Protein backbone atom coordinates (compact mmCIF):
# COMPACT_ATOMS: atom_id res chain seq x y z
CA UNK A 1 0.00 0.00 0.00
CA UNK A 2 2.95 2.35 0.61
CA UNK A 3 3.82 2.67 -3.11
CA UNK A 4 0.19 3.50 -3.87
CA UNK A 5 0.10 6.08 -1.09
CA UNK A 6 3.30 7.58 -2.52
CA UNK A 7 1.56 7.79 -5.92
CA UNK A 8 -1.43 9.42 -4.23
CA UNK A 9 0.83 11.96 -2.56
CA UNK A 10 2.54 12.75 -5.87
CA UNK A 11 -0.82 13.35 -7.56
CA UNK A 12 -1.91 15.51 -4.63
CA UNK A 13 1.26 17.59 -4.86
CA UNK A 14 0.78 18.15 -8.59
CA UNK A 15 -2.82 19.24 -8.11
CA UNK A 16 -1.86 21.50 -5.19
CA UNK A 17 0.65 23.21 -7.47
CA UNK A 18 -1.97 23.51 -10.19
CA UNK A 19 -4.32 25.06 -7.63
CA UNK A 20 -1.62 27.51 -6.59
CA UNK A 21 -1.16 28.57 -10.22
CA UNK A 22 -4.93 28.85 -10.65
CA UNK A 23 -5.03 31.27 -7.72
CA UNK A 24 -2.80 33.63 -9.67
CA UNK A 25 -4.81 33.09 -12.85
CA UNK A 26 -7.86 34.50 -11.08
CA UNK A 27 -5.94 37.69 -10.37
CA UNK A 28 -4.45 37.78 -13.88
CA UNK A 29 -7.88 37.31 -15.49
CA UNK A 30 -9.30 40.15 -13.39
CA UNK A 31 -6.39 42.43 -14.30
CA UNK A 32 -6.70 41.62 -18.02
CA UNK A 33 -10.46 42.19 -17.87
CA UNK A 34 -10.17 45.50 -16.02
CA UNK A 35 -7.27 46.74 -18.16
CA UNK A 36 -9.10 45.86 -21.36
CA UNK A 37 -12.20 47.74 -20.18
CA UNK A 38 -10.22 50.79 -19.03
CA UNK A 39 -8.23 50.99 -22.27
CA UNK A 40 -11.42 50.60 -24.30
CA UNK A 41 -13.17 53.44 -22.46
CA UNK A 42 -10.14 55.71 -22.04
CA UNK A 43 -8.56 55.35 -25.47
CA UNK A 44 -11.30 53.81 -27.62
CA UNK A 45 -9.07 50.81 -28.34
CA UNK A 46 -10.11 47.23 -27.79
CA UNK A 47 -8.42 43.95 -28.60
CA UNK A 48 -10.13 40.65 -29.23
CA UNK A 49 -6.87 38.99 -28.24
CA UNK A 50 -7.11 40.36 -24.69
CA UNK A 51 -10.75 39.35 -24.42
CA UNK A 52 -9.95 35.85 -25.63
CA UNK A 53 -6.97 35.65 -23.27
CA UNK A 54 -9.37 36.37 -20.42
CA UNK A 55 -11.66 33.57 -21.64
CA UNK A 56 -8.68 31.23 -21.91
CA UNK A 57 -7.64 31.96 -18.34
CA UNK A 58 -11.16 31.26 -17.08
CA UNK A 59 -11.25 28.00 -19.07
CA UNK A 60 -7.95 26.93 -17.50
CA UNK A 61 -9.29 27.85 -14.07
CA UNK A 62 -12.39 25.71 -14.54
CA UNK A 63 -10.73 22.70 -16.15
CA UNK A 64 -7.66 22.49 -13.90
CA UNK A 65 -9.33 23.97 -10.84
CA UNK A 66 -11.70 20.99 -10.77
CA UNK A 67 -8.95 18.55 -9.76
CA UNK A 68 -7.63 20.95 -7.11
CA UNK A 69 -11.14 21.50 -5.77
CA UNK A 70 -11.75 17.74 -5.65
CA UNK A 71 -8.50 17.22 -3.76
CA UNK A 72 -9.61 19.82 -1.21
CA UNK A 73 -13.06 18.15 -0.88
CA UNK A 74 -14.77 21.40 -1.87
CA UNK A 75 -17.00 20.29 -4.73
CA UNK A 76 -20.69 20.94 -4.36
CA UNK A 77 -22.45 17.79 -3.32
CA UNK A 78 -25.92 16.56 -2.56
CA UNK A 79 -25.70 14.89 0.80
CA UNK A 80 -29.08 13.19 0.93
CA UNK A 81 -27.55 9.85 1.92
CA UNK A 82 -24.08 10.98 2.96
CA UNK A 83 -25.23 12.68 6.17
CA UNK A 84 -26.87 9.52 7.49
CA UNK A 85 -23.86 7.26 6.95
CA UNK A 86 -21.13 6.42 9.41
CA UNK A 87 -17.61 7.58 8.60
CA UNK A 88 -16.86 4.15 7.16
CA UNK A 89 -20.04 4.29 5.09
CA UNK A 90 -19.04 7.71 3.78
CA UNK A 91 -15.66 6.31 2.76
CA UNK A 92 -17.41 3.50 0.89
CA UNK A 93 -19.79 5.93 -0.82
CA UNK A 94 -16.86 8.14 -1.87
CA UNK A 95 -14.98 5.10 -3.13
CA UNK A 96 -17.91 3.73 -5.16
CA UNK A 97 -18.85 7.13 -6.56
CA UNK A 98 -15.30 7.90 -7.60
CA UNK A 99 -14.57 4.46 -9.07
CA UNK A 100 -17.81 3.96 -10.96
CA UNK A 101 -18.86 7.49 -11.86
CA UNK A 102 -16.14 10.14 -11.64
CA UNK A 103 -13.16 8.30 -13.13
CA UNK A 104 -15.07 6.65 -16.01
CA UNK A 105 -16.83 9.93 -16.86
CA UNK A 106 -13.55 11.87 -16.83
CA UNK A 107 -11.76 9.31 -18.97
CA UNK A 108 -14.66 9.18 -21.44
CA UNK A 109 -14.77 12.97 -21.70
CA UNK A 110 -10.98 13.15 -22.13
CA UNK A 111 -11.19 10.50 -24.86
CA UNK A 112 -14.07 12.26 -26.63
CA UNK A 113 -12.44 15.69 -26.44
CA UNK A 114 -9.05 14.53 -27.73
CA UNK A 115 -10.10 14.52 -31.44
CA UNK A 116 -11.54 18.02 -30.91
CA UNK A 117 -8.07 19.17 -29.85
CA UNK A 118 -6.22 17.14 -32.49
CA UNK A 119 -8.31 18.56 -35.32
CA UNK A 120 -7.67 22.12 -34.11
CA UNK A 121 -3.95 21.37 -33.78
CA UNK A 122 -3.70 19.73 -37.21
CA UNK A 123 -5.15 22.76 -39.00
CA UNK A 124 -3.53 25.34 -36.71
CA UNK A 125 -6.95 26.66 -35.78
CA UNK A 126 -7.11 30.38 -35.09
CA UNK A 127 -9.84 32.57 -33.69
CA UNK A 128 -12.38 33.79 -36.21
CA UNK A 129 -12.11 37.25 -34.68
CA UNK A 130 -9.63 39.84 -35.92
CA UNK A 131 -6.68 39.92 -33.53
CA UNK A 132 -7.82 36.70 -31.88
CA UNK A 133 -5.61 33.96 -30.49
CA UNK A 134 -4.57 30.49 -31.58
CA UNK A 135 -7.33 28.06 -30.53
CA UNK A 136 -5.66 24.67 -30.32
CA UNK A 137 -3.78 25.29 -27.02
CA UNK A 138 -6.99 26.05 -25.16
CA UNK A 139 -8.67 23.04 -26.73
CA UNK A 140 -5.89 20.90 -25.24
CA UNK A 141 -6.95 22.11 -21.79
CA UNK A 142 -10.22 20.16 -22.10
CA UNK A 143 -8.80 16.60 -22.23
CA UNK A 144 -5.89 17.58 -19.96
CA UNK A 145 -8.26 18.92 -17.31
CA UNK A 146 -10.34 15.75 -17.38
CA UNK A 147 -7.20 13.60 -17.11
CA UNK A 148 -6.05 15.60 -14.07
CA UNK A 149 -9.48 15.21 -12.45
CA UNK A 150 -9.38 11.45 -13.15
CA UNK A 151 -5.88 11.25 -11.63
CA UNK A 152 -7.10 13.07 -8.53
CA UNK A 153 -9.91 10.52 -8.45
CA UNK A 154 -7.30 7.75 -8.44
CA UNK A 155 -5.55 9.50 -5.55
CA UNK A 156 -8.80 9.73 -3.60
CA UNK A 157 -9.58 6.06 -4.26
CA UNK A 158 -6.15 5.07 -2.92
CA UNK A 159 -6.67 7.20 0.20
CA UNK A 160 -10.17 5.80 0.80
CA UNK A 161 -8.94 2.20 0.47
CA UNK A 162 -6.07 2.93 2.86
CA UNK A 163 -8.51 4.51 5.32
CA UNK A 164 -10.84 1.51 5.09
CA UNK A 165 -7.87 -0.76 5.84
CA UNK A 166 -6.91 1.39 8.81
CA UNK A 167 -3.62 2.49 7.26
CA UNK A 168 -4.56 6.14 6.89
CA UNK A 169 -6.74 8.58 8.75
CA UNK A 170 -8.45 11.10 6.52
CA UNK A 171 -11.00 13.73 7.21
CA UNK A 172 -13.56 12.94 4.54
CA UNK A 173 -16.17 15.22 6.00
CA UNK A 174 -17.34 18.19 4.01
CA UNK A 175 -16.67 21.22 6.19
CA UNK A 176 -19.43 23.49 4.93
CA UNK A 177 -22.81 23.38 6.66
CA UNK A 178 -25.49 21.51 4.79
CA UNK A 179 -28.68 23.31 3.88
Where are these regions (language model features)?
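Alpha-helical transmembrane segments and membrane-interface helix-loop junctions
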Residues: 1-179
Amino acid sequence: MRPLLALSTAIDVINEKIGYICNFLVLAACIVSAANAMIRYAFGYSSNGWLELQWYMFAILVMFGASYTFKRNEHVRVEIFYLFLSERGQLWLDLIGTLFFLIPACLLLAYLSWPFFMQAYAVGEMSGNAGGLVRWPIKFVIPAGFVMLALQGVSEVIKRIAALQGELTIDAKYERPTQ
